[in-house]
Amino acid sequence: MRVARRSSIVITGYCVNIRTEIPVFSSLSIQESSSIDRRSNCFEFHVSSQAREKYHFDEQLFALNGNVVLADFAAARRFAKKMTKVRGQVVPASDINALGLIDEILHILIRQYEMQNPGVMQRVLGAVGLDARAVLLKFTEVFPPMAVYHREMDARHYLDLETAGQTNYASTLEEMLILHITNQNPAVGPYKELFDEEPLLRSSPYEHTVRALTDFFKGEPGFGDPETKAEDRESLIEVMLAPARIAPLSLSAQLEYLLNRWGVLLGESFVQKILRGIDFVKEDAVRGNFTGGFAGNVPVLTFTSHDYSEYERFSPDKDWMPQLILMAKNSYVWLDQLSKKYQRAILRLDQIPDEELDVLQQRGITGLWLIGLWERSIASQRMKQMMGQADAVASAYSLMDYQIAADLGGWDALQNLRWRAWQHGIRLSADMVPNHIGIDSRWVVDNPDWFLSLPYSPYPNYSFNGADLSNDDRVGIQIEDHYYYKTDAAVVFKRSDRWTGDTRFIYHGNDGTSMPWNDTAQLDYSKPEVREAIIQTILHVARNFPIIRFDAAMTLAKKHIQRLWFPEPGHGGAIPSRSEHGMTRDQFEAAIPNEFWREVVDRVAAEVPDTLLLAEAFWMMEGYFVRTLGMHRVYNSAFMHMLRDEDNAKYRQVIKNTLEFDPQVLKRYVNFMNNPDEKTAAEQFGTTEKYFGVLTLMVTLPGLPMIGHGQIEGLREKYGMEYRHAKWDESVDDNLVRGHEWRIFPLTHRRSLFANVEDFRLYDFYTQDPQNAGASGTVNEDVFAFSNRNGDERGLVVYHNKYAETRGWIMNSAAAMDKASGKLIQKTLSEALSLPKEAYAIFMDYVTGLEYIRSCQELTEKGIFLELGGYQCHVFLDWRIVNGEQWQVVCESLNGTGVPSVYGKFDGLFAAKVEEKIVAEKRVINKKAKSGKKIAKPRKNQSKPKTTL
């Protein structure tokens, strides 16, 4: 830590400063406190000679005054590495940095106090008496400046030297005061050996001197900011002890306290240093707790974020887009499975049998997402094979280039499959991975400046001595050694240019939620040439695939580019080592003025317009991605997680929130029961009633249904992105397939009824007696009930997502935003289905095959009453409106019961009467024939009432 009124030369590995200027403030005004910005970027604190020898600290870490100097986070990491090596347990570098920051802040507060109380630091030297000189002499021996440490001069000589016109006694007294304050701080306990005051207590009148210092400042005016009244100000000693009193066990919390209490006096530049120091603590916590995978609950989606302007610019759908049903297939695994099914080698895309395309068409599938089509990283494959996966291919998301893989048949094979799929009404879909690319990709070799990198390793404990993974003689590629031992997950890899000698450490792709993707290289989106290169690649993909899925798209929204890679001070911590490379909001806006995805959407719409853009996006950004950024579709992970966990009230709230905000967002959700990163649908939902109930919701709610690889067949293995073939020996669940044929595929072929939102309505299910619909009841949040229409077609879906029994009424819809009026509106079930007030409605339950008849008057006044068992589902379709008194008889006779045919029931009730009437008419005819009168021909089915659709 720099001592006031002392010159020092600071030399570190990456920082060379000569510091002599002492900040002097003419007042405590906020405006003028900015002069603190001229302070050095370096922080210092005391380290005893004993600790220096124990840990073998580097000479360049110390200033001439003997204090350890932390010029940047890298210096703190080197210091912590030395301690870690000796102790055998990790010393967080962020703690070392925090020690230096707190020490620096205490010095600044002393300087500020001097401005309020001029000459106080000169008076205190006289007040503590002659004993203080002996104490300061001992202090200088225990915590020696460089010249004393190297025996170039003794401690007394050093103290007699003058800096800025006064001896070093005064500045050393200030250092000793801060040393004492530091020793009273419980949070520094793990590091107390660095600056332990015990040697001073044992061999000098140190305790007496410290007591004299305390008494002196009690008698002086208190200290405070300009807003603090004189009577409310505390002594300087109390002010300096306050952080440890407020947060005795946390250095980070102490920094937060100092920031909140004294930030106005520290100046903007130093405030940012504190914020970055707090971020540094967060980064160390992240780095020490890499776990991977999804953790925690999925939050209920809301639409209240205002980080960036959220205007409405939906991309209009082409006519085919709302009816799309997407099937995901891991390309290599699927080809291997087809080879076994058809008993012949099926290795290329053009060898996929037409019979398989027939099957997809029969099942109502209109989109085929082929995962892993692109040429993959050779380094990624080598890494996996070196770790024991001998038959692995590279990850499907660590790419070499956007060319169809040669072993899949290349572009010719794709063209063949694309044409044949189109004959079956199926469009092909491919991934685009914009966030990162393979560590040995063409871009890493040819355009290293396109990637986020450092000229040095961000952590001193990283080593890069393993195999060269490069397939190009021009460069060397090495990942960090601890990967091979599974003891660390480095945030960078090493790229060595054999032609120029350039060495840089490129960041791995990372979304901040788990471990870095260590076979990938992170692109630098602050550079316009990178953004343009990615847009050109997207256009290339769009010209070959009408459906593009963007991997981890949320990481490239502006707010997350900054949060992850260029964090504002105080907002870092997501990715270790990035806080020190952050930007202010203004700096970031200058670098990336526009949302990248908005540019992509507009360019694709102009150049390849018949392309559906699908974003894998989470983090509460679903609405923003489709409504403002213009993506056609966006992942809705809440569907899978909440329905699996039976967080039914939460998912109903997701739907309600979406309807109240903008129903068009609901239409653009991608709903799924598994995705390649999650367990299979059979593992998560089983293969019985709950599975079919949730799947029914998936294919009848607005949005894009996405069916997983092997889901229909009941396969349970989760296929890794590096799999060439399935590893489990599984058989198709024929009963499950038949269940789909009976319950699901008839619905997929009627997707047009369910796809849109203009007539979609969600209902509350009130648990009430069947004869008491008007009484107040309780909403059963476990029941999902909704209706939709497409012209004259009507549909009502009801599903009970719980193993329990319930009964109640469906009557009024939840509120939905009417964009024409700008108001929230509700409708009754009868209004939503456009039913007449009189007449009768006949409809079929596609789950049971039974038909029902209800009075339209009852549907209008009461709604519909249902009794539901555990995981029971109804899909009421084929609504017909009939009139006539005879249908009243049919309705009353059935009393809500379902029958195979309502018309059959009608015939059963009235066939005898019809026959009697026919016999009577024949008698009249015969009688008239005998009398010679002209006979009118009877009308066919004249007793049947009129039916309307």
Enumerate the predicted regions with their spans.
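Carbohydrate-binding surface patches
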Residues: 770-830, 877
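Solvent-exposed beta-strand/loop surfaces of large extracellular or lumenal domains
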Residues: 836-861
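Alpha-amylase-like alpha-glycosidases and glucanotransferases acting on alpha-linked glucans and related
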Residues: 2-346, 405-419, 423-426, 438-750, ...
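Catalytic domains of carbohydrate-active enzymes, especially glycoside hydrolases
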Residues: 352-377, 381-386, 540-549
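C-terminal beta-strand-rich structural cap/linker in extracellular carbohydrate-active enzymes
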Residues: 859-890
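Charged, amphipathic alpha-helical linkers/stalks
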Residues: 883-930
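Aromatic-lined substrate-binding rim segments of carbohydrate-active enzymes
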Residues: 375-426
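Extended alpha-helical scaffolding regions
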Residues: 421, 915, 919-934, 938, ...
